[in-house]
Amino acid sequence: MSNTAQNEKRLPVGKDISTRRRTARARRHFRIRKTLSGTPETPRLVIHRTSRHMHAQVIDDVAGHTLVAASTMEADVRAMEGDKKARGAKVGQLIAERAKAAGIEAVVFDRAGYKYHGRVAALADAAREGGLKF
C-alpha cells in the first residue's frame, strides 16, 4: 500500500482541514495516554487549549479525581493584560501554586496531543518555575 493510500485511510476523506486536525490531535492524545498515567504520588498535569482559553488540571488517574485546576477563565487571569502566551504562563503559575499547596511536588506532563510550543510551552515552563517537577 502506498504512503498516500495509508494517509487517506487514516484521515476522514472529504472533511475540512479543521476536522482533520482535530481528529489527528485526538489520535495523538490517545497514543500519548496509552503510556502516561497519573498516580497519587505523581499525578498527571493535563492541559486543554481552545482558540481563546487554556485549562490545566492535575489528575490522579488511579482514583479518577481532579486534585487541582486552573484556567484562563478565572477572574484574575481574565483581567490580565497581554497575549494568550502570557495568560498561559499565568495559568502555569497558578497550577504550580495550587499543586504545592495540595502537597504535590512532581507531576507527569500530558500535552494532550498539542505541540510543545507557544502557549503549551509557556504553561509548562511557568509550572516548572513555580516549583513543579516534571
UniProtKB/Swiss-Prot annotation:
Listed GO CC annotations: cytosolic large ribosomal subunit
PANTHER family from the UniProt entry: 39S RIBOSOMAL PROTEIN L18, MITOCHONDRIAL, LARGE RIBOSOMAL SUBUNIT PROTEIN UL18M
Annotated keywords: Ribonucleoprotein, Ribosomal protein, RNA-binding, rRNA-binding
Pfam families (UniProt xref): Ribosomal_L18p
Source species taxonomy: Bacteria, Bacillati, Actinomycetota, Actinomycetes, Mycobacteriales
CDD domains in the cross-refs: Ribosomal_L18_L5e
Name of protein: Large ribosomal subunit protein uL18
Domain of life: Bacteria
Ranges annotated as biased composition (Basic and acidic residues): 7-19
Function: This is one of the proteins that bind and probably mediate the attachment of the 5S RNA into the large ribosomal subunit, where it forms part of the central protuberance.
